[in-house]
């Protein structure tokens, strides 16, 4: 039989436990990562059909090799369903951590949650998942990437200034449902809304691909032959737009001004040659920050919910000098 003193002690202990849980930081709910000599880490890439993704993968592989880490690499080939299956395979292989570049915001939520249930921490690279369904510090460790809204805003501000606030714009969007496409569209729209003469006359997805960007640009240029500018969510679609403009008998950089995002070697060369107005960098070299984050997390450090990549801006003033650094 419990004495009054014993009951009071148990109640006090229980109350303290509840209070501790209530005040525990969200990151404490994440699966831990033990410090050890060698890790087996998964990298679930979304695709590998463009220079940006190739550069990102090369950076991850090089940094893993530098630290003696076994990298389990998968390529979803642009399929969210395959990427979910890739993550499940990594879980089955017992990886210590998963770096995930999610194809789209919503479809990859089940993969993130399944990894958490399996006790495997996840770090998102380049793209986010839907924040209403999964949160950094609770369901995954952190997001490492650029500020896509700011990228779109910088592109819009440059175009508005260069065009003196007057332009009929064709927008080539990225993959529907992806965070960079959503955010780059938002940032650009915010920048040009201050200029009534800046009008988006057509906007359609080119899926971040050169060929599809060309096809979409051809269709939209036929529908809007008076367009004076093209805003592409990435450089690959901008390259496709060059071909579409030339096929329409228009001169890129003269008849139609193009602004884009990524900072690839092809884009910087086009800017230097006067074919393209400007491109906002989106740095693909994630390896150093990714594996630095792994090391910090293994030490028990609290990781900020967003590890920000800083990006440069390329135009006629610097593109030629920086081509050698591009990918």
What kind of region is each of these model predictions?
Residues 28-327:
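A residue-level marker of the well-folded mature domains of exported/periplasmic proteins
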Residues 1-24:
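N-terminal secretory signal peptides
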